[in-house]
Amino acid sequence: MFYEFALIGTTASGKSSFSIELAKEIEAVILSLDSLCLYKNIDIASAKPNKNELSIIKHFGINLVYPDSHFCVGDFIKEYHKAKEFAISKNCPLIITGGSGFYLKSMLKGLSPKLEKIKIELNNDEIWSIAEKIDPNFTSKFSKNDEFRLHKWYQIYKLTNEIPTNWLVKNTSAPTIQNLKIYELNWDKEELKNRIKNRTKIMLNSGLIDEAKKLFTTYPKDIKALKSIGLKECGEYFEAKLGDIKSKEAILNLENLISIHTIQLAKKQRTFNSGAFKDRIILDTKSLKVKHFLDKYLNL
C-alpha cells in the first residue's frame, strides 16, 4: 500500500540507518533529503548509504549530478515526483529522509517565483527599519539577523513595489505535499556531539582526505559542493593552513575543525526543524526500535 512520511533530524542523528531498517520491514523506497548525497563522487563526506545498502533498498535523490552541476529546489521536487510515482506503481510506502529541511519545507509550503538579483545598497538595520513600518507580519516572524530572508524581503520590495508578505501570498505555488506525517530523531546535545566526533573519525579513517583530494583536483575549488562541511576543511588542510600536511597535528586539527563545524550545523538544523515543522512528532532515540515505531506510529 502506498503512503508517505518523513524522517528528519540533525546530521549524525542516525536517519539513514533507521530509515533503511524501516524500509526493509515495510518494503518501502527512500527519497534522500540531503543536499550533498545528490552529488556523484561525494560518498564519504556526504555519509551516503553504501553500495550494499543502495542495492537492497531503492533510493531516489542520490548520485543525480556531478559536483559542478547546478541543482535547485525545483530539481528536487521533480525527483520527489519520480519517487512518488515509482512507489505508487509498486504499491509500496515512500520514506522521505535527510537533513536538508529546506527542501522539505519548500514542498510543504510551495515555491515563490525566482526573482532577478539586485544590488543591496542598504545595510540590514536600514532594511529592517523599512520592514517594521510596512510589513509587520514579516518582522514578527523573523529576526533582523537573518540576512538571507532580510535581503530576499528587500529584493521583493524593490522589484515589485508591493508589501513582500502580501506578494508572496499571491505568488507562491501550491504545496507539493499536503498532510505529511513528520518524525524527528532527537538526541541529547552532548550525546549528539559525541556521535558527531565519532562519525568524523570514521570518515577520516574511511578515506575522506583521498576523496577530497580527487574532488579538489577534478573540480574548481570555489564550487558550492566543495564548500560543504568535511570538504572545505580538507581544502584548508591541502593548503597547509592547518599545519604541515605530513604531520599528525594537521590531521588532528582537521578532525577537530570538521567536528566543530558539524556541531554548529546540527544546532542550526535543530533550530530550523523546530520552526519549520511545528507539528512534527519527536522520537526518543534512546528507546527507539523499528518494531516499536511500526507498532506505535504506523499501526503495523
Swiss-Prot record:
Swiss-Prot/TrEMBL GO biological process terms: tRNA modification
Report the catalytic activity: adenosine(37) in tRNA + dimethylallyl diphosphate = N(6)-dimethylallyladenosine(37) in tRNA + diphosphate
Q: Which Gene3D superfamilies match?
A: Crystal structure of tRNA isopentenylpyrophosphate transferase (bh2366) domain, P-loop containing nucleotide triphosphate hydrolases
EC number annotated for this UniProt entry: 2.5.1.75
Q: Which cofactor does it need?
A: Mg(2+)
Q: Respond yes or no to whether keyword NAD is given for this record.
A: no
User: A single Gene Ontology molecular function, please?
Assistant: tRNA dimethylallyltransferase activity
Would the keyword tRNA processing turn up in this protein's UniProt record?
yes
Q: Which UniProt keywords apply?
A: ATP-binding, Magnesium, Nucleotide-binding, Transferase, tRNA processing
Q: Where is this region: Interaction with substrate tRNA?
A: 34-37
Binding, substrate? T11, A12, S13, G14, K15, S16
Q: Where is this site: Interaction with substrate tRNA?
A: S100
A Pfam family reported for this protein in Swiss-Prot or TrEMBL = IPPT
Kindly list the cysteine pairs connected by disulfide bridges: none
Residues annotated as binding ATP are: G9, T10, T11, A12, S13, G14, K15, S16
Broadest EC class assigned to this enzyme = transferase
Q: Which InterPro entries match?
A: Dimethylallyltransferase, IPT, P-loop_NTPase
**How does it associate, per the subunit comment?**
Monomer.
Family from the record = Belongs to the IPP transferase family.
Please describe what this protein does.
Catalyzes the transfer of a dimethylallyl group onto the adenine at position 37 in tRNAs that read codons beginning with uridine, leading to the formation of N6-(dimethylallyl)adenosine (i(6)A).
Protein name as it appears in the record: tRNA dimethylallyltransferase
